[in-house]
Amino acid sequence: MSRRVFASAVLLLIVVTMCCGGAATAQVGSNADASTPGSALTGAIAGEGSSSGGVEGLQRVDLFVPQKTQVLPKKGPDSSRRDSFFSPSLVSAGGVIAAFAEGHINTKNPHNESAKPFSDVVAGYIDSAWEWPTLVEKVSESTWQAHTVLGKAEGKKSLDVVLRPTTTTKGNKVFLLAGSTDLSYVNWSWREGSLELKLVVGDVTKPTSSEPTERIKWGEIKSLLNESTIAAQKGKLTEFLASGGSGVVMEDGTIVFSLMAVNEKKDGVFSLIIYSKDNGSTWSLSEGISPAKCGAPRITEWEGSLLMIVDCENDQRVYVSRDMGTTWTEAIGTLSGVGSTHNWETIGRRLAVEALITVTIEGRKVMLYTQRGYALGETETTSPLYLWVTDNNRSFFVGPVGMDNAVKGELAGALLYSDGGLHLLQRRDSGEDSVMSLSRLTEELKEIKSVLSTWSQKDVFFSSLSIPTVGLVAVLSDAAGDGRWYDEYLCLNATVTNATKVKDGFQLTEPDSRAVWSVNIPDGNVRHISLSHNFTLVASVIIEEAPSGNTPLLTAVLVDAGPEYFMRLSYTADNKWMTMLKDEKKPTTESRPWEAGKEHQVALMLQGNKASVYVDGELLGEEEVPLTGEKPLEIFAFCFGACKIDGDEEESSPKEIGKKPRVTVTNVFLYNRPLNSTEMRAIKDRIPVPTRAPEPQVKIAPKPAAPAAPAGNEETARETGDGGANGDAVSAYGRVLLPLLFLLGLWGLATA
């Protein structure tokens, strides 16, 4: 039986809107049990779909199993079972991990008034101190039970069907928001009433036994919206539904949930937020909303701003708000495979971001997110769910944590990092039913910590040499092997062909010697870098001797909506530099010479629609680039050495005339922003930051200790030590969300 039980014309809009999202979503409906009344609420909004099974090696246990797990009501000893579980949500507070899901009982006879279908919100409680074997043992016992938190069993009106539990915590309080409606039997079918938002708050109490089942005491159910609250929104919205997943507690303590809504015109689904600045006593709707036909929002906080990811008709987008949803700014520019350039009608919902949370690991604030991709060696009907970590400069591909069967639908999951553990609550199929399983991502967390440690070490090292680290995405230096030039930040390696390893780089000694660094080219199993219309690539090169003719040194290949565009720096036999910055491929020879055996610094820069080439920190040439500025660069690659492009003239190779190229390329730095001349000079000079001599010890009368900084504000203290090279960059870029959005595989923010 389908999870959805409604057929109103109002919410049918939501189904139509979200079913347009892709083939995977549409398949959910085709696999639903036809015995259930059609649902407009989340028949396609949620679209959680199914999993073909887990990924080998994961620690996983089933928490909620259809027709097996006993569910206790709030009052009374009589338990019951559910037919299926949907919409996972996961939180932790006061030493208790609480896993939530919709629990559905399906009617076998939709034309029988006595067989009324319903759904409620159920929860399972786990002691966060349990080791994994203990957790598995407890959950596997016959006494393991789930608990009803919000549903008709409590005798409340408009709770026949409760959908999309959305949770967050503040202190020892758990906030649960859900959508609800009642059912009435009219003309031999079930009809739903109007949608309502219900909130219930639980207090985590001190343990009275070894079991966590009584640790959360739930309060009274509260309706969140009234006429004045809705009228204040000014968007003429009429019905609201919780988004599911996770809410957010902002740095200032504001509690935020994401919602979906329809307006009086019934012209599509809108996404927005509801928030409380007084610990849940009163609530306000955001004035701003997403465009029509953009639903299933996920939200997270980053440096005081809200990020909201929405699923639209043909793509996935991200919006940012710095004023609690009064205004939402769409980020411009996306990664390949996400957005309008690769819509869901052609690739389904692959490469879409799913769960998204902001956490602090090892003292570093990062975002964790899951994203579907392509499984190498798998059929087109399967795609793994990947886990990623980003720190607003760079992202790291951790690995697959689930496998999606694209024929049946899509995975739904919720991430939680708490008490030193990383968990994933995930819905997966079990025949006709859906199971909620919990995974503890122990090995994945170890890898994340190792990567974050590497990032910190590299930042400190480069800063000690006065090299700017703000916006530094990747570095190619001394690490190499197996035909690869390893990125020091572990994000993306370059591929090297017929080159000799030297200190900090490679020497290109053959006619076909080259090093290729591909970015913005999606590959499900490759760690990638994501750039938009702002970047700088800086490298050190030594030309050992003059070539026989014009020889490419550094090429960037860009593809926007139109034909390919090339940025190229070459060197000539008469010791001149040559630039090519036009798609007509007409090179310009510069009078400035290169010197054999001397280390030169070369740089390619793209700033909006302006492409520039620099040598030794001085501008060699620049041109306007025919880029739209509205779409991401679909193909983007850097190449050192023999990188032939269409239109290159056939010339006698150095081998044919007895002369081979000899160019050494070392220390390549890639930034997701433009650099100024001072910063490029700092990279070239690499002046160590002087260490301060020990201060003389002077005895001073003790003073009262200053109050400790408020918890959660540790990110306001930022690393320095780059000899001033980062000064301007920090103010200009330090808090810009652009790099973060690109790394996520979403619409990038063009201007802060």
From Swiss-Prot:
It is an enzyme of class 3 (hydrolase). It catalyses: Hydrolysis of alpha-(2->3)-, alpha-(2->6)-, alpha-(2->8)- glycosidic linkages of terminal sialic acid residues in oligosaccharides, glycoproteins, glycolipids, colominic acid and synthetic substrates. Developmentally regulated neuraminidase implicated in parasite invasion of cells. May contribute to the pathology during T.cruzi infection by cleaving sialic acid from cells of the immune system. Belongs to the glycosyl hydrolase 33 family. The parasite mammalian stage surface antigen exhibits extensive antigenic diversity. Residues 1-23 form the signal peptide. InterPro entries: ConA-like_dom_sf, Sialidase, Sialidase_fam, Sialidase_sf, Sialidase_trypan, Trans-sialidase_CS, TS_C. GO terms for biological process: ganglioside catabolic process; oligosaccharide catabolic process. GO terms for molecular function: exo-alpha-sialidase activity. GO terms for cellular component: cytoplasm; intracellular membrane-bounded organelle; membrane. BNR repeats lie at residues 274-285, 319-330. The gene is SA85-1.1. Pfam families: BNR_3, Tr-sialidase_C, TS_C. Residues 701-711 have a biased composition (Low complexity). It comes from Trypanosoma cruzi. It comes from the Eukaryota. This is Sialidase 85-1.1. Its EC number is 3.2.1.18. Keywords: Glycosidase, Hydrolase, Repeat, Signal. Residues 693-725 are annotated as: Disordered.
